[in-house]
A protein has these predicted regions:
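Short, glycine/acidic-rich hinge or "gate" loops at secondary-structure transitions
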Residues: 89-91, 105-106, 230-231, 402-411
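Short, glycine-/Ser/Thr-/acidic-enriched flexible segments
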Residues: 159-161, 191, 200-202, 260-262, ...
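An anionic, glycine-rich sequence signature occurring as long contiguous blocks
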Residues: 4-22, 254-365, 451-465
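Short, conserved catalytic/metal-binding motifs centered on acidic residues
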Residues: 40, 73-74, 85-88, 114-118, ...
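Short amphipathic alpha-helical "interface-anchor" segments enriched in bulky aromatics
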Residues: 40, 341-382, 386, 390-398
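Domain-level cores of phosphate- or acyl-group-handling catalytic modules
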Residues: 205-264
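Dynamic "connector" segments at or just before major functional cores
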Residues: 1-205, 209-224, 249, 398, ...
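Basic, amphipathic alpha-helical segments enriched in Lys/Arg and hydrophobic/aromatic residues
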Residues: 75, 370-437, 445
Length: 465
């Protein structure tokens, strides 16, 4: 009988000593992150809400892992940069992931779920399950406020999710030049809090489709906050009469949308652009004479008399008339807001929506929301929700637990590298578990701060199992 040779890692000699490595360390983990994520999750009850939204059709006699454990395991893995479901095959025995899922870390009978289990989960959810999960995200957002806020900004944006196979409802999008999905993300623009998301086919959505989604979200928000001022904000893809009418049906809702130039609107900007061309040329000439830096652009803000025939009412149309060295850059915004000046509407209110794109980048680049490679459209929606849940945990960690620290504004990838990827030796006794972290850890004080805040934070997570 042949004997297996342990897999070794070889390194160049150091100080006359040979150096070898192996994977026989035993109860060691390279991920401290699940313990932090567990603390955040217990505080907000996210995976409890999401799992409760799924109709568990499994026979109780054959259930080894509860639905809440499955959802939490997948979300925690993504939040620790393990976006591939196959990673569960190795991580199911990881002591820290088991401890984060409230299982005994060194008990072989308490191993976590494997990749095939998650494949069955993703492909077993129904459209009704996913709808309830979308509502669970909205409920989590509402619960994140101790009292009804005076105002929230509901930022909406689409994001390209390129597809490379034969996924259901993956269509060619001329704007992006490839086959893709086009998920819709909703965030609260002032805080960065996630509201919900919907995976959409790759074609450009119609106004009635966006309005159908927003109507359900607004209904849930209004049930909790009857008089909160809500401002809908989006780029030119959302300046359609259906969303405008939706805002106008609610006395406490307004909108501010980008507006695409057309054969009627664009000529209205020309007098202002012509004036700014002369001003810009004069400013540049004066700067050159004085040996100063030549101004990059000259811009002014105006309100123009314009109303599209499809609009449900008369709204303010704001123009940014900008002249640059390479030409003109007229931009338009339409809004139902009466009081702010044209400059305030465009510069301070509308341009702030660019932060929404940063939130989407975090979900997409750091938390793999575009890992939608399953053939099933519903399974890919489930994968999107897993990444969104990972974002929620990171956002709460960053804004609540890490507030005032060096990582208060860090992206998820930075938090993962600095806080989550720490070597831990796990020792399990009869009545306790000890976690031994590196003696030379450079973030001891920060880890102490984080764990103490999570330890004393109230938990709304009900007992699972």
């Amino acid at each position: 009988m042949s004997e297996s040779t342990p897999e070794q890692l070889r390194f160049p000699p150091v100080a006359g000593l040979s150096v070898r490595g192996d994977f026989d360390g035993g109860a060691l983990s390279s991920d401290f992150g699940p313990m932090i994520l567990r603390g955040v999750d217990r505080q907000i009850g996210l995976t409890e809400r999401l799992s409760a939204a799924i109709d568990d059709r499994r026979h109780p006699s054959y259930v080894t892992h509860t639905m809440r454990e499955l959802v939490a395991q997948r979300v925690y893995q993504i939040a620790c940069a393990y976006e591939d479901g196959n990673d569960a095959n190795a991580l199911r025995r990881d002591a820290l992931f088991k401890l984060g899922l409230e299982r005994k870390p060194l008990d072989a009978a308490m191993d976590l779920a494997s990749a095939p289990t998650f494949s069955r989960l993703e492909n077993g959810v129904s459209a009704r399950d996913l709808y309830r999960m979308a509502r669970a995200f909205v409920e989590t957002f509402i619960a994140s406020y101790d009292a009804p806020p005076k105002v929230i900004v509901l930022d909406m944006d689409h994001c390209e999710d390129a597809t490379h196979g034969q996924q259901e409802l993956a269509f060619y999008n001329h704007h992006y030049g490839n086959y893709c999905y086009l998920p819709l993300f909703l965030f609260e623009g002032l805080s960065g809090k996630f509201i919900t998301a919907v995976l959409r086919p790759g074609k450009r959505p119609k106004g009635v489709e966006n309005a159908m989604i927003l109507k359900r979200v607004l209904k849930a928000l209004r049930a909790a906050w009857p008089t909160t001022r809500i401002v809908l904000r989006g780029d030119g893809h959302f300046s359609n009469p259906e969303l405008m009418a939706l805002a106008m049906d609610d006395p406490y809702t307004d909108f501010i949308f980008g507006l695409t130039g057309n054969r009627v609107l664009t000529p209205l900007a020309e007098p202002f652009l012509e004036h700014n061309r002369k001003v810009h040329a004069l400013r540049c000439e004066n700067a050159r004479r004085a040996g100063a830096t030549v101004p990059h652009s000259t811009r002014t803000y105006h309100e123009v008399d314009y109303r599209a025939g499809s609009w449900p009412g008369p709204f303010r149309t704001i123009l940014k008339a900008e002249v640059m060295e390479l030409g003109t850059n007229p931009r338009f915004v339409v809004t139902s807001l009466d009081l702010p000046s044209p400059e305030c509407v465009y510069r301070d209110l509308y341009c702030a929506r660019g932060q929404d794109e940063n939130f989407i980048k975090m979900i997409k680049n750091d938390l793999a929301s575009d890992r939608t490679s399953d053939h099933s459209f519903l399974a890919n929606q489930m994968r999107l929700f897993f990444s969104c849940a990972a974002y929620v945990l990171h956002q709460v960690l960053r804004s609540d637990i890490l507030a005032g620290t060096e990582l208060a504004n860090a992206q998820p990838s930075t938090v993962i590298i600095k806080l989550f990827k720490l070597a831990v030796r796990v020792v399990q006794y009869k009545d306790r578990v000890r976690l031994h972290l590196p003696s030379s850890c450079p973030l001891k004080a920060l880890l102490k701060h984080v764990t103490e805040k999570l330890f004393f934070a109230p938990s709304i997570l009900t007992a699972s199992g």
